[in-house]
Amino acid sequence: MSIPHSAKQSSPLSSRRRSVTNTTPLLTPRHSRDNSSTQISSAKNITSSSPSTITNESSKRNKQNLVLSTSFISTKRLENSAPSPTSPLMARRTRSTMTKALLNLKAEINNQYQELARLRKKKDDIEHLRDSTISDIYSGSYSTNHLQKHSMRIRANTQLREIDNSIKRVEKHIFDLKQQFDKKRQRSLTTSSSIKADVGSIRNDDGQNNDSEELGDHDSLTDQVTLDDEYLTTPTSGTERNSQQNLNRNSTVNSRNNENHSTLSIPDLDGSNKVNLTGDTEKDLGDLENENQIFTSTTTEAATWLVSDYMQSFQEKNVNPDFIAQKANGLVTLLKEHSEIRKDLVLTSFMSSIQNLLLNGNKLIAASAYRVCRYLINSSIFIDELLELRLDAFIIISLAKDNSFQIEREQALKMVRRFIEYNNGVTQGIMQAIISCVEKPEDSLRHMALETLLELCFVAPEMVKECRGMRVIEGFLQDYTSFSLASVILDTILQLMATHKTRQHFLEDFNVSVLTTVFSDTNTKSNVNVEKMQNASTLISITLNSYNGFMLFSNNNFKPLKQLVSFFQIPICAQYLIDIFLDVLKIKPLPYKPRGRHSHSFKPIPSQYYKECMSVNQRLALIVLILENSEFVPHLLELLNEEDRDDHLVAKGRYLLTEYFNLRMNLVDKKYTSVSKPIYKENFTYVNETFQFKKIAYKMNRNRNTIGMSGIDYAQNIKSFSKNIKENTLLREVDDFRFRRMVYDSKVLQTKDFTRWNWNIINELLEGPLLNKKQLEELVKSTKFIRRLLVFYRPLRLRFSNVNKGAKLSQKYVQVGCQFFKTLTATPEGMKILMDDTKIIPQLASLMFRAMEGNISGNIFNKNKLREKIIFGYFKFIGILTQSKNGVHILTRWNFFTVIYKMFQFESKLGLEFLLLTIPELDLKYSSHCRVIIGKALVVANEKVRIEATKHIGDKLKELLSTKESDLKLKANKVKLQQFKMEMLTRQLYDLSPSVVAVADQALYECIVAGNGSEELGTSFRMFLNQMVFIRSPILFELLSRPYGFQLLNEINFVKEERDSWLSKKNIEYVHIVEEFLKKNESINAKSLTFQQKSRLPLHFYESLTKTEDGILLLSQTGDLVTFMNVIKKYVNGNNMATVENAKEILDLKAALWCVGFIGSTELGIGLLDNYSLVEDIIEVAYNASVTSVRFTAFYVLGLISMTREGCEILDEMGWNCCVSVQDEPIGIALPNRLDRFLSYNEHKWSAFGEYSDEMIVFNKSDGDLIEKCLPIEFDLDKLLKEKDTAENPLNEKIITNKYDNDITSQTITVSGENSSLFANEGLSSPYVTQYRNDDDSIESKVLHIVSQLGNHILSNHAVKEITEINNKYGPRLFENEKMFFKVFNMMSKYRFKPHVRKFLCGLFINNRALENVIRHDNKRDKRPANFTR
């Protein structure tokens, strides 16, 4: 297939040459794409005529004779290719009506195909979204995530049905259009053939013309040229200059590309027909500006031709940088749009052109070359070919340049990053160049180079280690001013320590104590930089909150951590250390705010450990144990015992110490920790200090309980106890005298002003004495006490009904009113009072009914009164009346239920508000009306009402389940009511509103989790199980953990399907979810739970399964435990546990560990683990796994196993300590007795038994003798001398005064294999090598020795002076020959030089001129032909 090209017309300015005006480049920068008219090049470069001789008439003719530019199109046309018109005007031929109809049909078919592709893509996206919601792993506490996913599945299924219908419609429409197209095509065959012949003859005539030279002026490249990742942007030039040559593209394009570019193929539905349109489908070329646009639908074949043309244009010499930049932009854009053509190109034929571009001194041209190479890379093989072309040397030279070459250096670094993607091509020399960029503070590419270096730590850790890259990275951690950068580096280092692959190279090079240098410098500085101290504290806290972080701080018997806590002796550092450990122990977050503002207000808050998941507390217990072994308490006590103490600092220290002891007692062991040294000061007694500790301890523990006792509700117990005492005392022990005294003290009889009444005494009377039949009757007959209370609560008296919500005793009025109606309905005398009263209930019924009718004038039930007054209290009174048969009788007598039914009409907003206030107060036990009302509210159209009714049913069900009835009749009634409420609640699972479903689902979940479930519940669940499975409710897992629930779920095949799902994918998904959960809970802020339930790990299928005997039986029959066991034992017994880091194997191992852990966390499952000795294998993983996350997964799993007594016994036998509660019950925390084994990396084992004890010599002050015999400290003198030599001569070069070794190879400099042939064959004709005399080797040795001295900052100044003198004497003959190039190049690759030294060496030795000699030598050595294939 060929690209249509234009023939050229003769210009009136010259009869010998053709003038061709240039169009805008084929691929232009974004900012240069405009619609400006194409400039016409001047004729002064073609003829001797001046521009003034050109007449207006000739100019017009020139504009009319504009032709397409062919600077990038070959004049040779492939066979069977369609000819192009001789000019844009010739393409404007009249089309027939049939041709237009075919074109319109073709366009419409294409549009329909695009629409079909769009619909199918949309369908795929929706299916992917729907499939992502299928897998549900429930969180430990209730959430509505499963309902959100359920709603997403429903929406996705609805959208899929609609899209399927749309796809069918589009396919039918395409079929109809193709039928029309086929019919019209048959009638137009003759016409199309004639048109094709006519156009072909015209193009064949034009095809004989030759290509003409494009002329134009270029704007010069300015220094402000910038380069982004999309284009090399240059100022837009009017024309471009191409060499006058015929391009032969047959060498770079496969023969299979010989197809017609202008042929349109439209497949039929059956795939058998193909429509060919030639001339009639060509684009109208009438307007020249239309040709200046980028080809938007370039075919693969045409793109291949254009790539070849771009590459040919790079071979031209002495071209303007703008031209190269625009061609590079075009080539890159083409490669982006047609990446498939890369494999069809033979690139070796023009890679020499890339070399020439890189050798060009212009930064824009070099940047263009880098960018083109970057987009041509598609394999490691091609990268190897680039390295053979010395691309690594080019990159090193570019990176050594200053910031004025930003555009070139940026592209060179991006080229390195492209190498990283293929894990190939990054040499040691490139690594040193990147490190040099990182070391230079003023380098504009410093952060980009640092990012690259951090990536190389994962890709090529060994090379980074050889180049001592970690030392450079460590330097950024000491620059606390850039906290965001330091935190990223710290996170990267911690990740490097996570696996053996990278850890083995950096563990010895990285010293975690570098984070504490800011504290070390505090003693030597008068002023403390608060921002640096806060940033350092935050970094230390981040480190200690990560697994690898506290393993690094625990290294060498906790030596780094001991160094850290020793800074408690410095008061300035102590305040920051306290903040750090408060954060690490999850007591209180760091108080630092942005911009270094410190929060000086100190408010102690209690730790929330008792609300946390036990796995989170297990990690916290480990940190407490680490601090216990790091002399944390003694150093903190020394701070509190300072003579000159800061009271604020001491208060924080007490707070930290108190909370630390609390955590230690609850999470580590139940023994109290004794303080060895009492805190004492002359005027600050031991008793006072004890009082301060007691005060803060009481304050912290006031609202929390010891672990194991948290289930005891002391407040509720006290309330129940006081209530019973009050009832018994008031009922039995109140005599007549005291009763009369209480009535008198209430002041109800003395005054009608209710604000002066003693409402507490009134409430005591209603709760006690007035429940006595005799006393109530006496009070009614002899006083107006009851009457005045009735009058107070009558709506139309405007006493109670006129009290504001914000009044002092407003809630007391409501509370006493509820007790008043409860007391009256409890006795016959009270019922008589209510039956005789014709005011309160009738007025309420009348006022509410009138309000719903719209009569709110003078009515207390209106919108404003409901908002401002305590009118809601009347609805509570109605609820009290529904709680007894007598109360229901009162409501029935005054037809109050009719008023409630009226509320459902929703004729006014007041009716809805009344209903929302009434529903929560109704009791369902005594009135069928109430049950009907609630049933109606559950299905009413208004969503708010349904939510409120569903919530009310759930609350009443939990309340009913918590009560116990001893009477058989009452028990039977309770079961019936329970079934009714359960049925009503489970029906709500079918509601169309997700909010209603969520309320019902949560209520059912809470009922089961609370442990109040029974087989009666299971019977009620039976008919709704399928719906629960449909919405994927977490109730299913709670049911699965109960015997009756397992049977129900097994009947509907849920257990088998869920098991298959977990084995296939959910076990792996659980690993990611639980790790995210544990990471999220590293933060201090405790999550507020929606109901009283302790935080738990995400629910696991095998945990619920193994809580029943049926589940254990199923587990044994299926062999799942054996499968998990095999995965673990394969890892443990594979003899490569210390190095296995395959991602899939590690993920499978973690999944198996969690499964085994949850099986072992149950009373029935732990026996299975003991049978297979799995606990021992898990401990082995915890001690020796190479991947840190695997080690801590085993740690958490052992904590799960310790949740049973039998599990604790097994772990105790194997050297792990299990924590128990005050009731001697396991709490699920297991800690290793050998912390050194658990916290040691396999690459650096350490022991806590004396191997790293500090040698101390202690003298007796009286006689000067040694107190105890200590071994003398031995010094390794050879090692000290070696370190001294290394410091003075880091390059390890032999220093010989006034003498230089003639043999450079005898030094530590080595020559790579690829350059060895250069030294072995010096007989090649070289402009410099052949001129050497015998003494030249000694000069080279001298130069290289001087170069080695440049690495020593003491000798560098003299070396620069000396090498400059040699350069002035010998010049390029010595400094730019290829032999010296490679020797200096290898030295720069092997040794570290400062950035300014590297720039100096590159200017002398590693420059373009020397590199050009090397490339010339390579070409002669290889005798490479001009074109060859790989």
UniProtKB/Swiss-Prot annotation:
One GO location term (cellular component): TORC2 complex
Gene3D superfamilies in UniProt: Leucine-rich Repeat Variant
Keywords: Cell membrane, Coiled coil, Guanine-nucleotide releasing factor, Membrane, Phosphoprotein, Vacuole
Chain positions found as Phosphoserine: S19, S81, S84, S87, S141
A GO BP entry: TORC2 signaling
Signal peptide start and end residues: none
Topology of this chain in the membrane: Peripheral membrane protein
Modifications made to the protein after synthesis: Phosphorylated by TOR2; when part of TORC2.
Source species, domain of life: Eukaryota
Principal location class: membrane
Stretches for region Disordered: 1-62, 182-285
Function statement: Essential component of TORC2, which regulates cell cycle-dependent polarization of the actin-cytoskeleton and cell wall integrity. TORC2 controls polarity of the actin cytoskeleton, which is required for orienting the secretory pathway toward discrete growth sites, via the RHO1/PKC1/MAPK cell integrity pathway. TSC11 may exert its functions through two distinct mechanisms, one mediated by AVO1 and the other mediated by AVO2 and SLM1.
Miscellaneous field: Present with 1840 molecules/cell in log phase SD medium.
Name of the molecule in the record: Target of rapamycin complex 2 subunit TSC11
